[in-house]
Amino acid sequence: MSLREKTISGAKWSAIATVIIIGLGLVQMTVLARIIDNHQFGLLTVSLVIIALADTLSDFGIANSIIQRKEISHLELTTLYWLNVGLGIVVCVAVFLLSDLIGDVLNNPDLAPLIKTLSLAFVVIPHGQQFRALMQKELEFNKIGMIETSAVLAGFTCTVVSAHFWPLAMTAILGYLVNSAVRTLLFGYFGRKIYRPGLHFSLASVAPNLRFGAWLTADSIINYLNTNLSTLVLARILGAGVAGGYNLAYNVAVVPPMKLNPIITRVLFPAFAKIQDDTEKLRVNFYKLLSVVGIINFPALLGLMVVSNNFVPLVFGEKWNSIIPVLQLLCVVGLLRSVGNPIGSLLMAKARVDISFKFNVFKTFLFIPAIVIGGQMAGAIGVTLGFLLVQIINTILSYFVMIKPVLGSSYRQYILSLWLPFYLSLPTLVVSYALGIVLKGQLALGMLLAVQIATGVLAFVVMIVLSRHPLVVEVKRQFCRSEKMKMLLRAG
């Protein structure tokens, strides 16, 4: 199978698995938002935000360093495996011991037992990380998809069932541990058919991996602050309940694109790595990737923005109506972040994550005051506006700081790659918004939302079918199995 065929096959398997995982995550979040109180929901979201940093530290970029290397020896793999395990134990102990201090700093001492319980995951998770990286390196996304879907389903079942009997944040924490255990066991079982770690350790042999991982980890930490500081600031200033509401909106508008984009970017990182020496080919494929990511995300986020006033009370309940303006602003944030995501794959493929790190450090100096001042002045809305302002600046500067040094001057291609998905999504935005105004009060809330979504989707489908843009035609051809279908979708 050629690299192109493997890449397309991998994207399809990743798409199926990721859509299922996102769907289960949204259902779980909706159930929890409805049956546990705002404070408990806030404690859950804040504890998961904190544990995300520990997760980044425990991996230390080792998994991606394995993928980036064209060739890697058994000694190097074994050393990296035991290094991962050791880091996991260190992170587990550190998080456990610091949990009370973290709760006090955030003015939420109830966080401590949740964080202590979550820390146990870091003894388990490292045993599966390397096997996942090896499967990804070989583009075996069918196995990865089945394993991750099974693990999420196990965690989802545990959380939802136990939450009905015990409506507390701890139920979701236990579900997370079940998810981690199942995921690690399955990756370990299938991964050992590829390779088995030995009892060897040579730190000198993995120096290149550690240098790559150090840059990647530093970049991830800065990116973590730029992503999650808003939740932590709100938790400290206004309490876990407000932070939970903000995070609920964030998980609807920003997190799905962050999880959907790896359908493409995780598959194309190893593919980019294989053509890292051909700048022209990289440039063409990168801008195609940018447009495809936009086509996936723009219509959904612009549509959500205009239906959010009906979506929130129907799905989460009226007790969360205060998050509607926050959700609308975060839809724009999510849209801008979605088109920034592929840049990471490009820089990793060229082993230039140092550029991303330096830029993210600069962005952090903008982000921290924007979030803190916004939170002090206008609460959740102020934090969201600060986030949006920094994201707009980030989108403008990304080309000059990160793309141009790697791909050369190509500003026109950058703008056109963003314009295409926006242009295709405009009818969805207009139709859904207009129907929301015209039919307000004439239909039940659920029916009105269904009509808005259905017509918005139809408008986007019509635009895709009618489009003769070369990239859109190329994408449509991937779904055509017959000449009749090609004619129907105008993909000939």
Curated annotation (Swiss-Prot):
Its main location: membrane. InterPro entries: Poly_Biosynth_Transport, Polysacc_synth. GO terms for cellular component: plasma membrane. Pathway: Bacterial outer membrane biogenesis; lipopolysaccharide biosynthesis. It holds the Pfam family Polysacc_synt. Residues 34-42, 103-104, 179-236, 310-322, 386, 439-445 are periplasmic. The chain crosses the membrane at residues 13-33, 43-63, 82-102, 105-125, 158-178, 237-257, 289-309, 323-343, 365-385, 387-407, 418-438, 446-466. Residues 1-12, 64-81, 126-157, 258-288, 344-364, 408-417, 467-492 are cytoplasmic. NCBIfam families: PRK10459.1. PANTHER family: LIPOPOLYSACCHARIDE BIOSYNTHESIS PROTEIN WZXC, PST FAMILY PREDICTED COLANIC ACID TRANSPORTER. This is Lipopolysaccharide biosynthesis protein WzxC. The gene is wzxC.
